Structures are given as C-alpha cells and as structure tokens.
Amino acid sequence: WRQYVPSACTYENAVPHALLWGEKALLARLRGMEQADWVQAAHGSEGLWSKVWKAVQAQPDYERVLEASKSKRYPRTRLQRLLLCAYLGIDTQTLLREAPYVRVLAFDEMGRTVLRQAKKDARLTLINAGQTPPDEVYYALERRCAALYGLFAMQPELFSEQVARIYQKPLGPA
C-alpha cells in the first residue's frame, strides 16, 4: 500500500490521538444517553446494553467501564466496538450499509494514475477534498464522526486544520 500513499499522508505523520485526551467527552456523551438510546447502538444485545449502561453511569473512567462490563460472554473488543458506536451514534443498520463513495484524501503521481483508472472502473463515486458527496445522510455521519474524533487529538487545532482541508470547498479566484 505504501506505493500508493504519499509519505506525508501516512499514519506516522498524522496528528497524535489518544483515548485519554477525549475520555471526558466520551463519558459525557455516553452518560447522557438514555437506556433506549443504547438499544440502537451497534454491537449490543439485550443483556449487554443494560450492563454497559449501568457501568457507564457508575464508573469514573473508560477503563473501569470496560472492566465492569467485561466477561467471557462479552469480551473487551466487543465492548470497545459497542462504546465507540454508541459514542458516534452508529446503529447496526448504518454499520451494515455499504459506503456510497470513496473520499480521496491525497495522492501523488502514481496515485493520479490509479485514480484516473478508478474513475473509469469504480463502482463507487470518488470524492475529492471540498466536494460534497451525493449521499447527504452518510456525509453528515462522516462529518459528525470526524468532529467527535477530533476531541481525542493531542493538538485539536491541528486536527481542525486537517478536517477543514478535507471538507471545506477551496476558495476560487476572486
């Protein structure tokens, strides 16, 4: 994959993120959810929603929520997926939905060649920075998730600049 991704766009060069930096935002959102909201979250089930909801209300941090909810039946990874989907407002139907477009974030000369071919052969629409995709519902979800993910950035202002480059239309000639 490295041959298709410019080095400036690799994970190593991304704005640093960590759970710790956004933990309060995560817990605030999860604590504000009603039990009925948990039923909508992907990766849950009848007993799990109730168990996690109680842990979120009682535990002081994310790690303790996981510890209080974890069991043989509900492993840590499933709990993490449930909490992330609940935080982002993603239900099972949305999770199973096929992506309606591909957002191109960056490319070099080799990528330009690949994109030219992809435009001819692709089943999905290719969207560049500043373009609004045809599916408004999915686009709104994408923007909401990006905004919430930004709360986990060590330097939120740098992440905000990256998001602005992706979603804002470039200024044309005056």
Task: Set out the residue ranges of the language-model regions.
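Active-site cores that bind ATP or allylic diphosphates and position pyrophosphate for catalysis
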Residues: 1-174
